[in-house]
Amino acid sequence: MIYLKVQENEYPAYISGRLIDRDWDGRASKSITLTMTPAQAAQLFTDGLGWSIVQRETVPDGTDGGTETMQEWDNADYCVAGPITDHRDGTLTVKMGKYTQLEEALRQIGEALA
């Protein structure tokens, strides 16, 4: 099972990515589909959000329950909040993206001048 992890909270989710998102200035992006209200999503998914993808699986080990394994991938580089699409079935999709090269250069110039 795949989860979105924000701080210590995990949300079941489907997550896909694009190296070049032509619908969003050509930036790399991740689309996160989960069960949440639009108001909750707008509050949670903001610029600068640190988040990760968690995969949990139960691996057979000869016992009745098996052993749970967990892998986690940091996605803090995808920190630009994008559009929220309400599917009107209790789920929504949120886009989180990386800065474009131009945005990154402008950020660095701004930091150097500060």
How would you name each of these model-derived features?
Residues M36-P60:
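Extended Gly/Ser/Thr-rich low-complexity repeat segments
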Residues M1-K5, S31-T35, G50-S52:
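Ordered hydrophobic segments in well-structured contexts
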Residues M1-D25:
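Short, intrinsically disordered N-terminal pre-domain segments
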Residues E10, P38-Q40, T100:
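Residues that cap or initiate secondary-structure elements
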Residues M1, R18-R22, T37-A42, C79-A81:
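Intrinsically disordered, low-complexity boundary segments flanking structured domains
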Residues I2-V6, Q55-A114:
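Viral virion structural and adsorption modules
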Residues I20-T37, D86-G97:
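Generic recognition of long tandem-repeat/solenoid scaffolds
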